[in-house]
Amino acid sequence: SQKQDKRIIKSHYDNKNDLFSWFLGSKMIYTSCYFKSIDESLEDAQENKINLIAQKMQLKEDDELLDIGCGWGTLVAHLAKHYGVNTTGVTIAQAGAEWATRQIREYGVEDRAKVWTIDYRDIPTDKKYNKITCLEMAEHVGIKYFKKFMKQCYDLLEDDGIFYLQIAGLRERSNLLQKKNREDLVWGLFMNEYIFSGADASMPLNWDLQRLEKVGFEVHSVENIGNHY
């Protein structure tokens, strides 16, 4: 529910910008980086990640991009400045939205980038975007509402648009309680308790792909970037 999500986000993210900056660095990117070599710094790998997204999204100037679950707004600000994209970020984390707004101002892209502090369920439907990104936010939606959320993303996307989804999950296992599979079970429980409070990252890749295709998406490519964590 929206009430539950606000409670979880407030306890996990709000008023903790200093804490997150200690291990996320100046770019404040919470999702996986992308290391081209083991000698790269965290900031280099974070920038690699953004540029990889831009490449996969086939971004061009004046694209209209919606980032659902924009965190501290780094992707929104970076793509607006370096790719000339018109970006809109969505988050319910007040502290993150304030950081993002300040970052947009520092990047000098107030005319191209903005952040809405609203629940993803309340994203206006009167406008469509030709590019949509969702980086490790769908886990917070949960299994029950995942397909409905994917349908929402599909409906917000232009007919020839591109949707970039990054999502965490477990490997396909018939019985997680078996001794040989308990590592995945423990990983999932740890993530839910300490990393993504209230989130569900328990489903295998084929589960995600099936639901993407059922709402109308055509899957163009899949890349496993788990080792970059």
Feature-to-residue mapping (PLM):
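Conserved SAM-binding loop of SAM-dependent methyltransferases across substrates and taxa
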Residues: 72-83
